[in-house]
Amino acid sequence: MSPPSAKSMEEGRTPSVQYGYGDPKTLEGEIEEHTATKRGLSSRQLQLLAIGGCIGTGLFVGTSTVLTQTGPAPLLMSYIVMASIVWFVMNVLGEMTTYLPIRGVSVPYLIGRFTEPSIGFASGYNYWYSFAMLLASEVTASGLIIEYWNPPVSVGLWIAIVLVVILALNVFAVEWYGESEFWFAGLKILAIIGLIILGVVLFFGGGPNHDRLGFRYWQDPGAFNPYLVPGDTGKFLGFWTALIKSGFSFIFSPELITTAAGEVEAPRRNIPKATKRFIYRVFTFYILGSLVIGVTVAYNDPTLEAGVESGGSGAGASPFVVAIQNAGIGGLNHVVNAAILISAWSSGNAWCYAGSRTLYSLAGEGQAPKIFTRTNRTGVPYVAVLATWTIGLLSFLNLSSSGQTVFYWFTNITTVGGFINWVLIGIAYLRFRKALQFHGMLDMLPFKTPLQPYGTYYVMFIISILTLTNGYAVFFPGRFTASDFLVSYIVFAIFLALYAGHKIWYRTPWLTKVSEVDIFTGKDEIDRLCENDMERQPRNWLERVWWWIF
């Protein structure tokens, strides 16, 4: 029996727009009405967009906190585990997005479409808020990184400059954003590759002092720094803490490809390509980077501990810089600080893009004011960009010490919010697979990834436990504070309030029936768009190498 058509599918179900979620067909209609986004992102831009958002201050600086608290072994182990989780999250998003890379698509749109409207609503605002706060976080980091050079003007001026540049790159044509992010990300990749090579040189004693490090610091002071309690229990808690904290380095990076799907050329060719190559780069940069950090800096290094305790965000708190200084290499710390600045600036650029497209998608679904669907003549949803960028002004809170405390709350909330959304992505993917199986279409997927659905079960299990235990340390004797408890768990209240409020108001079902999950609307349009898409063949060896990389 042949699968039902999109028309017959819609005739046999209740339109989801009655719940305020917005039918996929409505999404397309609203976007067309206000000038659609343009497919202006190339394959090379899409690939570096994702990895560029992933390589941020978490890798260059955030690793210092994990190293000092837990030791080099938990740092490496946690990055391996988190990279495997990101691989599966990226794969399931790649499958769903390649199947339906429609205009205005976003991760919460897919979640709501394949689960039920209230989950999509809560997820959507969780995503938008998190992206906007991450923008503010990276802008703040940029200002503090510049402070490393002790400029004669206030950090507030640098924050303003960074914000204005990010707005300019996002409010004009998407090609501007894509090209700027391509070069930003390229510089970050060169920086991390250079630091990894430098680490290998220091490992074998190639520095100015010719001190062969080897695995010295894994023996003294040791591979593990017991956390909270001594012995093996403390070592395990160190690993678990490292796993929780490493989430900030990876969070939301898989979603960037889905966010850009509606604006990329030849989506069914370029999205799978970006998905496959993204994870290779993550494994290379993050795992090798964490290994280099662990062998070149001791977890009890006084300079590193001082940088972490001072709350620095620039080169002074970077384990890479500490390793360079210990090796007696002069001047290179300024180069690394410039690389960290580019990293933070680029990540802020990516989060502004992701937040604006998420808000744009919410408005197209009827979940946000219609004004956010407005686009300019180049296809950029400028109202959504301005709304997301405005949240970035919270970065000025860091001009006061009390503001830094409040801002610390916001940035921690985004990490937990990201964990919650990864669990929801898993649920949406399982529902997507069941709907395809129901209609006998599972083998018709244009892009299939290995180890599914078992990889999704693995992600949901690990991330659920991480989410529930992310604030476990506050329950140890003498460590409980109301602020730390709220930082760890208030995101649950926010998410549940959004979810329950929408469900009570619209009386949505607990889950859309598998037989009614819409896997058809928009598919015919994408099939027509991609049916004549033929990949160009390289004309010479230079093109062959270039296309192999990008």
Curated annotation (Swiss-Prot):
Q: Which residues lie on this side of the membrane: Extracellular?
A: 69-72, 148-152, 205-236, 299-321, 400-406, 479-484
- This protein's GO CC annotations: membrane
- Work out whether the entry's keyword set contains Transmembrane: yes
Q: Which residues lie toward the Cytoplasmic compartment? A: 1-47, 94-126, 174-183, 258-277, 343-378, 428-457, 506-550
Q: What induces it?
A: By L-proline.
Region listing for Disordered, in residue ranges: 1-24
Subcellular localization, as worded in the UniProt entry: Membrane
Q: Which top-level group of life is the source organism from?
A: Eukaryota
Kindly give the membrane topology term recorded for this protein: Multi-pass membrane protein
- Please give the chief subcellular localization of this protein: membrane
Parts forming coiled coils = none
**What are the BP-aspect GO terms?**
amino acid transmembrane transport
Keywords attached to this Swiss-Prot or TrEMBL record, sorted alphabetically, are: Amino-acid transport, Membrane, Transmembrane, Transmembrane helix, Transport
Tell me the GO molecular function terms.
amino acid transmembrane transporter activity
What residues form the membrane-spanning segments? 48-68, 73-93, 127-147, 153-173, 184-204, 237-257, 278-298, 322-342, 379-399, 407-427, 458-478, 485-505
| Known function | Required for high-affinity proline transport.
Question: Which protein, by its recorded name, is this?
Answer: Proline-specific permease
Q: Which organism is it from?
A: Emericella nidulans (strain FGSC A4 / ATCC 38163 / CBS 112.46 / NRRL 194 / M139)
* Gene responsible for this protein: prnB
